[in-house]
Amino acid sequence: MNWTELSIVVNHEVEPLVTDILENYGSNGVVIEDSNDLINQPADKFGEIYELKQEDYPEKGVRLKAYFNELKFDDSLRNKIKTAVTNLENIDSTVLNFSEQTIAEVDWENEWKNYFHPFRASEKFTIVPSWEQYTKEDDSEMCIELDPGMAFGTGDHPTTSMCLKAIETYVDSDNSVIDVGTGSGILSIASHLLGVKRIKALDIDELAVNVAKENFAKNHCEDAIEAVPGNLLKNETEKFDIVIANILAHIIEDMIEDAYNTLNKDGYFITSGIIEEKHKQILNKMQNVGFDIKSVNHDNGWVCIVGQKVSE
């Protein structure tokens, strides 16, 4: 199977919206190449510099590379994406550019690894590719070894970083955690590293469940985390202290009431994957259901919300 790489250059202001469009239309991964990275490329903390090549980055704005199964990427899908992006309110037509190419499966399986290096995702957590060697800076640093596979994120997206920071703040070792839409399993692994004993990782995609299980094994926690296919929380009967969901906003909106019902009293709902334009809508529904909003964090057009269940 081959992949169609759809490359879209846009102004920075609309990057989260375009990412959301691509994910909604079924992209199997999005690579972000930001022109600002050429200006702000410090020596990294691992003792070497990953030098960025100017020719790999747009002159202005952000290049988003989205990957679609070639057999599913037809004229209809192409036109829907172009129309949705072109019609965005704050799109800069002087920056906007579309291009595409076909990438063979064997090339893509390794190509995405060029973008993935060890990085500090939060105060405590460092994400380390499974194929790289890394030495911790100090004993307090917690390393998550990750091989996300081509269809899942590497943990460097703002939504993941904000979720990890929320986990550091709100998750205790005596809590129970359910991770909805686990993907690569990174948030479940983080919970395990904090000492959580009961963790359940759900994903509607069986491929995601398998990738998560492989990453659990890499982090020596495969026996500590239950990873199963599941359709959000619709059939969940067990109660948990923490519900985590880093997924798309419209899916989060549909599961807010189920999240509330799944939580024990005083439990927390940690959720991200929400673009700025939709966060008030999500906030309002969470409050209407009964959540006490504990924090709302913003990062590069994305939002992470934490709500607490304060009564049964």
Swiss-Prot record:
Keyword Ligase recorded: no
Localization, UniProt: Cytoplasm
Class in the EC hierarchy, top level: transferase
InterPro entries in the record: Ribosomal_L11_MeTrfase_PrmA (IPR050078), Ribosomal_PrmA_MeTrfase (IPR004498), SAM-dependent_MTases_sf (IPR029063)
Enzyme Commission number(s) of this protein: 2.1.1.-
UniProt entry keywords in alphabetical sequence: Cytoplasm, Methyltransferase, S-adenosyl-L-methionine, Transferase
An example Gene Ontology CC term for this record: cytoplasm
Protein's UniProt name: Ribosomal protein L11 methyltransferase
